Structure formats: C-alpha cells, structure tokens
UniProtKB/Swiss-Prot annotation:
Organism: Escherichia coli O157:H7
Keyword Cytoplasm belongs to the record: yes
GO molecular function, one term: uroporphyrinogen decarboxylase activity
Subunit organization: Homodimer.
Pathway(s) of this molecule: Porphyrin-containing compound metabolism; protoporphyrin-IX biosynthesis; coproporphyrinogen-III from 5-aminolevulinate: step 4/4
GO CC terms of this entry: cytosol
The protein's name: Uroporphyrinogen decarboxylase
Function: Catalyzes the decarboxylation of four acetate groups of uroporphyrinogen-III to yield coproporphyrinogen-III.
Entry-linked NCBIfam families: hemE
Family note: Belongs to the uroporphyrinogen decarboxylase family.
Subcellular location: Cytoplasm
CDD domains per record: URO-D
Sites annotated Transition state stabilizer: 77
Length: 354
C-alpha cells in the first residue's frame, strides 16, 4: 500500500506526538456541499450513491478538495448491515430510513442471516478499495459501523424514533429476544468492520447514536456489552500499522470510564460533555475526539474561532485529541464556515504541541 503522507489522525488516536491537532468532521461528505448534492442527483437516490463505488469515492473525496482535513471517512450508511439482513430498507421523504419488515419477536431474529461482508456488503468493500486507491496516501481512511443497540433501534422500531417505546417494550418484556438480536448484530458488525480493515480502512469507528436514551444499567447490558464484544473481535493491526478503534455514544458522557475499559483506543464526545473533565477522567487510557456543537458553524467566523480556542484550551497541552464536531455537520451550514473551523484548529493548536 502507498506510504501515508499525513498520519496525524492515527498518531493522535494512539496518543503519540503530533505537530498540530488533527481535525475531521462527522458527515463531512454531505448535503452542506453543493458538489455533493450534484453527485447525489446523478446517482438518483441515497442508496444508489452508497452502492456505486466510483460515486461513493467521489463524495468521500469532495471535502478533502475543499479543506485540509486529516482523515477521510467512508461514504456509507449505518443501515447497510440491517439492509443486508433482508429487512427491506427504503427512504421515506421527510421521514428518513424505514424498514418494510421490522423485527418483532425472537422468531424474526432467528430468521435473520449474518451477512457475508464480501457478498451482500461487497459494494462497501469495493468503495473502501476505490477510495484507498484514489486517496494515494494523502490521509487515512476511516471505516465505520453503527453499534448493535443503535442498529437494533431502527430494526425493531421500523425506522427512526423519538421515544423508542417499541424497542424498550422488547427490552423490558422480552429481553431474551433483544439479546439474541444484539448478539447477531455484534457478530455481523465485527465481520463487517474486519472486512473494511482488510479492504483498506486504516481506523474504524462505532457509532452508538442512540445509546444515550438508556439508563446506566441498561446501557451497560444492551449497548456497551455488545460494543465490547466487537472491539474484542477486531483486527487491531493491518499493513504493518495499528488500526485504532473509536467508540462514540451520543449522550454517553456519564459513562466514559466504562467505555474506556473496552480496549478501544479513543472515545468520541458529543458537545454536552466538557472535554477538560473528560480528559481528567479517562485521558490516561484513551484519546478523545470532539467536540464542538455542530450548530456553532452557523456563527460568524470570529465566534467559531473563539469556540475552537476554548475547546483546545479545555483539552490542554499534549497528545490524544482529535478535533471534531460533537455530531454530524448540519446540511444548511455555509461551506466556508466549515473551512474557518478546520483552518482554526490547525492554526490555534500548534502551541499545545510544542
């Protein structure tokens, strides 16, 4: 494989010295960029964009042409795994993702296959290989998956949810069925991420978008336990380099200590967690990624710079910080504000690495 020209992101995740704090943005390939909208229109719909390796590569690279980002992230969706299990994923205008055959009971779980990542999910691996080739070693490529709990919420609810009553009903009334589903998902996700690593992903991230809706005890049993299983099953070295793993539970700031015990390399923080406090609690064990409020990108440039400076000062001197937003970038943010953000991170962080 090509020699990596900029390995800041990988080094920071392993808490090794860097010259400036690396930065990337969740959903950096997305609807805030006019060029993304043009490519998506060309693809026809969202899943057609994900399933076309050339177009998925194009949208992955678009933000890197605009901004000096320190990592690329595979353009895909967390729902590729349940889709490959045969649940019939489709997108409803204004409602987001839906499934034609939601999981309602243990019998439904028993029927679900564990998808072969090189077969049913082969289009994702093709995209990874294509992106790695086109990146030419400029920056590392991040692979990712949703967490078992987060994937299960969509599979049981039949789509997005605000109250999560359907899956919580299963959790409390039929926990055996939910554990069977989560176990199958943990196996599927570990295979899926390992296939991404073999195809060329140089780091991986597990997005637990909905872990924060659980009580502390339920989070341990129904979310963290299964992420821990995945981390235990991952390839941690490939192509002569360590492959760092980041866990991100949105709304999970109160559980950082437990998350840091999983053996992951880094934890993602949302904007509701104070980064100085997070570093005091777990900074001797894991790197931290985050954590500016994505809505700050609506602010004037001077205010964005001020917020970047505040978060950098909060983390302080030394290694182990990857700058990011606390969740995905909003689709109506001015692209030049994202540029202000990225440039400010590099310029203002230099003093913390001397």
């Amino acid at each position: 494989m090509t020699e990596l020209k900029n390995d800041r992101y990988l080094r920071a995740l392993l808490r090794q010295p860097v010259d400036v704090t690396p930065v990337w943005m969740m959903r950096q390939a997305g609807r805030y960029l006019p060029e993304y909208k043009a490519t998506r229109a060309q693809a026809g719909d969202f899943m057609s964009l994900c399933k076309n390796a050339e177009l998925a590569c194009e949208v992955t690279l678009q933000p890197l042409r605009r901004y000096p980002l320190d990592a690329a992230i595979l353009f895909s969706d967390i729902l590729t795994v349940p889709d490959a299990m045969g649940l019939g994923l489709y997108f409803e205008a204004g409602e987001g993702p839906r499934f034609t055959s939601p999981v309602t009971c243990k019998a439904d779980v028993d029927k679900l296959p564990i998808p072969d990542p090189e077969d049913e999910l082969g289009y994702v691996m093709n995209a990874v290989r294509t992106i790695r080739r086109e990146l030419k070693g400029e920056v590392p490529l991040i692979g990712f998956s949703g967490s078992p709990w987060t994937l299960a919420t969509y599979m049981v609810e039949g789509g997005s949810s605000k109250a999560f009553t359907v899956i919580k009903k299963m959790m409390y009334a039929d926990p055996q069925a939910l554990h069977a589903l989560l176990d199958k998902l943990a196996k599927s996700v570990a295979l899926y991420l390992n296939a991404q690593i073999k195809a060329g992903a140089q780091a991986v991230m597990i997005f637990d978008t909905w872990g924060g809706v659980l009580t502390g005890r339920d989070y341990q049993q129904f979310s963290l336990y299964y992420m821990h299983k995945i981390v235990d099953g991952l390839l941690r070295e490939n192509d002569g380099r360590r492959v760092p793993v980041t866990l991100f539970t949105k709304g999970g700031g109160q559980w950082l200590e437990a998350m840091a015990e999983t053996g992951c390399d880094a934890l993602g923080l949302d904007w509701t967690t104070d980064i100085a406090d997070a570093r005091r609690r777990v900074g001797n064990k894991v790197a931290l990624q985050g954590n500016m409020d994505p809505s700050m990108l609506y602010a004037p440039p001077a205010r964005i710079e001020e917020e970047v400076a505040t978060i950098l000062a909060g983390f302080g001197h030394g290694e182990g910080h990857v700058f990011n937003l606390g969740h995905g970038i909003h689709q109506d943010v001015p692209p030049e504000h994202a540029g202000v953000f990225v440039e400010a991170v590099h310029r203002l962080s230099e003093q913390y690495h001397r």
